[in-house]
UniProtKB/Swiss-Prot annotation:
Catalytic site positions: D52 (nucleophile), D54 (proton donor)
This protein's name: Cytosolic purine 5'-nucleotidase
Source species of the chain: Bos taurus (Bovine)
UniProt EC number: 3.1.3.5, 3.1.3.99, 2.7.1.77
Required for tetramer assembly: region residues: 548-560
Lineage: Eukaryota, Metazoa, Chordata, Craniata, Vertebrata
Length: 560
């Protein structure tokens, strides 16, 4: 007879983790199939699965798609008067990464941490360090909330733009026809500030996306630019069996239809042998022209799309949800009303940390799944270059050994210069494994602004949402403990506390003291017999009262 889990939980010795120190690892999926957890999420509570299209359902091939966007933007700049020489530039995917900040005053690309501390500074293709950096950033720090000056390049669509900004700054700084200035460049009596140059690039990028030929060229060669995954119909059909599925994209219907038709263009349906189904059949609700992030606030007028012509029908749609109907505009409130769902019932899956994740989380309370395609390469470096990480750990041990027997009475000063140089060299080698700007998530031991945003706003994240295929819909995604240095570097072993060295250590706050202190408290209050407050002292909770991030708030309410 098999022992049930509830019985095994009664005996800690039978817990799987106690059978083997590293037992948890054998229960984990393969790294490239994993979904990573910032906040616990019970999948069985999710009633609706929402999707963005661009870079989520439709993953664009890299660097082919970025190269196309780069070329079209350069052509647009040349057409409005920028030098012909710019046409010689080609997109280099090894340079940019997401999450960089462009300083519109000095023309620098900056990689910063969550607090605005500089991690990397590049002026064009020139990486600036030390005293040169401090001339422009005295404390190696920026005010991130100065959005007039600093622009965060957070999206995958920003990658070509990021590299183009570096190309332009480098060109105008080094081309002998122009005179480089601190905040821009001169051509004779004409001055162009980096702020003006940046605005020209922003306008050119928007023109390429909304008025130019980017979408036209994409649909002309979908096989070249769009990833097609045979597991997509299977996952969406399984989602539809356990809940409702909706699409909310900023793209117009004609483009959406062509992309989605290609993604579901298989001779079979969800499984080999099943009949082919049109892409619309996999969704309960389809919204185009969503205009996110406005969609998560006041939104826009909800209208109905004529799928034969792609044009919008006049008037605001006010009826119930109809299967097979495509809607334009609307808002996140519209989604909740039409699907009969509320905030935490919905898991929204997207790639845009601001337009998809931050706004859906902060304004609607939707659960969030961030798609980070770069994670596949980040994991490859993390595992393939493990020797570099191990060497850094060894160097830390060498440092600890040098200081092991020294305290404040020691006059000895160990020479750690060679170890410091080696740490810098290994850290640099590790950074370069990711690309010229280093990892998307860190610079050495410090996490980037992008990493902090992922941890703050994304409940779940993965290289692809297809990874949900490898988990049951009853799965509890449980967040790991986020350890502080005093927790991650101190072993779980008993330590005898010296009360003289640490007087506050005697301030034992655990409930085991309560019985002992009852008598002391009685001694303090025994003379007060006539008038007493309703409760003289707090009592230790006998039931769970703290929020432990187990995604079980509703279950607790039901139990009450």
């Amino acid at each position: 007879m098999t022992t049930s889990w509830s019985d095994r939980l009664q005996n800690a010795a039978d817990m799987p983790a106690n059978m083997d120190k590293h037992a948890l690892k054998k229960y984990r999926r393969e790294a490239y199939h994993r979904v990573f957890v910032n906040r616990s999420l019970a999948m069985e509570k999710i009633k609706c699965f929402g999707f963005d299209m661009d870079y989520t359902l439709a993953v664009y091939k890299s660097p082919e798609y970025e190269s196309l966007g780069f070329e079209l933007t350069v052509e647009r700049l040349v057409s409005i008067g920028y030098p012909q020489e710019l046409l010689s530039f080609a997109y280099d995917s090894t340079f940019p990464t997401r999450g960089l900040v462009f300083d519109t005053l000095y023309g620098n690309l900056l990689k910063v941490d969550a607090y605005g501390n500089l991690l990397v500074c590049a002026h064009g293709f020139n990486f600036i360090r030390g005293p040169e950096t401090r001339e422009q950033y005295p404390n190696k720090f920026i005010q991130r909330d100065d959005t007039e000056r600093f622009y965060i390049l957070n999206t995958l669509f920003n990658l070509p733009e990021t590299y183009l900004l570096a190309c332009l700054v480098d060109f105008f700084t080094n081309c002998p026809r122009y005179t480089s200035c601190e905040t821009g460049f001169k051509d004779g009596d004409l001055f162009m500030s980096y702020r003006s140059m940046f605005q020209d690039v922003r306008d050119a990028v928007d023109w390429v996306h909304y008025k130019g030929s980017l979408k036209e060229k994409t649909v002309e060669n979908l096989e070249k630019y769009v990833v097609k995954d045979g597991k997509l119909p299977l996952l969406l059909s399984r989602m539809k069996e356990v809940g409702k599925v909706f699409l909310a994209t900023n793209s117009d219907y004609k483009y959406t239809d062509k992309i989605m038709t290609y993604l579901f263009d298989f001779p079979h349906g969800p499984k080999p042998g099943s009949s082919h189904r049109p892409w619309q059949s996999y969704f309960d609700l389809i919204l185009v022209d969503a205009r996110k992030p406005l969609f998560f606030g006041e939104g826009t007028v909800l209208r109905q799309v004529d799928t034969k012509t792609g044009k919008l029908k006049i008037g605001t749609y006010t009826g119930p949800l109809q299967h097979g109907i495509v809607y334009s505009g609307g808002s996140s409130d519209t989604v909740c009303d039409l699907l009969g769902a509320k905030g935490k019932d919905i898991l929204y899956i997207g790639d845009h940390i601001f337009g998809d994740i931050l706004k859906s989380k902060k304004r609607q309370g939707w659960r969030t799944f961030l798609v980070i395609p770069e994670l596949a390469q980040e994991l490859h470096v993390w595992t393939d270059k493990s020797s570099l990480f191990e060497e850094l750990q060894s160097l830390d041990i060498f440092l600890a050994e040098l200081y092991k027997h020294l305290d404040s009475s020691s006059n000895e000063r160990p020479d750690i210069s060679s170890i410091q140089r080696r740490i810098k060299k290994v850290t640099h080698d590790m950074d370069m494994c990711y690309g010229m700007m280093g990892s998307l998530f860190r610079s050495g031991s410090r996490q980037t602004l992008f990493a902090s945003q992922v941890m703050r706003y994304a409940d779940l994240y993965a290289a692809s949402f297809i990874n949900l295929l490898y988990y049951p819909f009853s799965y509890l995604f449980r967040a790991a403990h986020v350890l502080m240095p005093h927790e991650s570097t101190v072993e779980h072993t008993h330590v005898d506390i010296n009360e003289m060295e640490s007087p506050l250590a005697t301030r034992n706050r655990t409930s085991v003291d309560f019985k002992d202190t009852d008598y002391k408290r009685h001694q303090l209050t025994r003379s007060i017999s006539e008038i007493k407050p309703p409760n003289l002292f707090p009592l230790a909770p006998q039931e769970i009262t703290h929020c432990h991030d187990e995604d079980d708030d509703e279950e607790e309410e039901e139990e009450e």
